[in-house]
Amino acid sequence: MQKEELTRDPNLTNPLVLAFLGDATYSHCVRYHLIAKGLVKPNQLHKAANRYVSAKAQANVLLTLMPTLPEEELNVVKRGRNAKSGSSAKNADIIDYRHATAFEALIGYLYLSGKEERIAEIVQQAFAIVEGES
């Protein structure tokens, strides 16, 4: 898959745009992970994916990882957390929703920055955190 070249500086990109991209990137990683684990029934996949992508799960992942994030990534997290979204959380409290947005913004920022190895590292940590909850 060929990526189009972006000339936009990820540091100047609206954090909600970063979160939009991060949501898609993280969801893709989750779905691939679940299929690799052997889940093939659509209903099973949907239920299992929700366990990873819910606002509550993403907030927990972010709060667990925050003490280990470098300053550059923490700045992105703060921008994402403080971004004013036009929508509200459907099935989450506002605090979890904001932290989930911050997590997605971080993933989007890393994607736009071309830091795919760092995304893989964070995603693997996220999977371990979510799977350790059961």
Swiss-Prot record:
Q: What's one GO BP annotation on this UniProt entry?
A: rRNA processing
Primary subcellular site in the record, as a coarse category = cytoplasm
- Alphabetically ordered keywords of this record: Cytoplasm, Endonuclease, Hydrolase, Magnesium, Nuclease, Ribosome biogenesis, RNA-binding, rRNA processing, rRNA-binding
- Please tell me which top-level EC class this enzyme sits in: hydrolase
**GO CC annotation terms, alphabetical:** cytoplasm
Q: What is the active site of this protein?
A: D23
What EC number(s) does its UniProt record assign?
Answer: 3.1.26.-
Q: Name one GO molecular function term.
A: rRNA binding
SUPFAM superfamilies given for it? RNase III domain-like (SSF69065)
Location(s), subcellular:
Cytoplasm
Q: Which cofactor does it need?
A: Mg(2+)
Free-text function comment from the UniProt entry:
Involved in correct processing of both the 5' and 3' ends of 23S rRNA precursor. Processes 30S rRNA precursor transcript even in absence of ribonuclease 3 (Rnc); Rnc processes 30S rRNA into smaller rRNA precursors.
Subunit-level organization = Homodimer.
What family is it from? Belongs to the MrnC RNase family.
Q: Please report the name of this protein according to its UniProt entry.
A: Mini-ribonuclease 3
Tell me what organism the protein belongs to: Brevibacillus brevis (strain 47 / JCM 6285 / NBRC 100599)
Q: Which gene encodes it?
A: mrnC
